[in-house]
Amino acid sequence: MLKFVVVICLVIMAITFAEKCGDQECGEGTCCLDYSQQHCSRLGKLYDMCSDPNDKTDSGSHIFFCQCETGLRCDKTSWSCQKG
């Protein structure tokens, strides 16, 4: 039981101290996602799920997926990164 309590406390601490992000804080090749918590995630590679680069929240974060990396586009039919 004590181990369970310790694990729960660690999870709560991790959530409490999680770094908030914006695209300015995320490094090159990443974007800020606002999915349950804000966190940096890598840009979409070929066939990865993606979001339109213009679809952002008021704070500048993406909701579920990052935009595609340079040279790829987000196909709005399949919502996946495709070539050019």
Swiss-Prot record:
Q: Which UniProt keywords apply?
A: Disulfide bond, Secreted, Signal
Record-annotated disulphide pairs: C21-C32, C26-C40, C31-C66, C50-C74, C68-C81
Pfam families attached to this UniProt entry: MIT_LIKE_ACTX
Does the keyword field hold Signal? yes
Compartments (UniProt record): Secreted
Signal peptide region: 1-18
Give the highest taxon in the source lineage.
Eukaryota
Q: Which Gene3D superfamilies match?
A: Lipase, subunit A (2.10.80.10)
Q: Which GO terms describe its cellular component?
A: extracellular region
Q: What is this protein's tissue specificity according to the annotation?
A: Expressed by the venom gland.
**Protein family (similarity comment):** Belongs to the MIT-like AcTx family.
Q: What is this protein called?
A: U1-hexatoxin-Iw1a
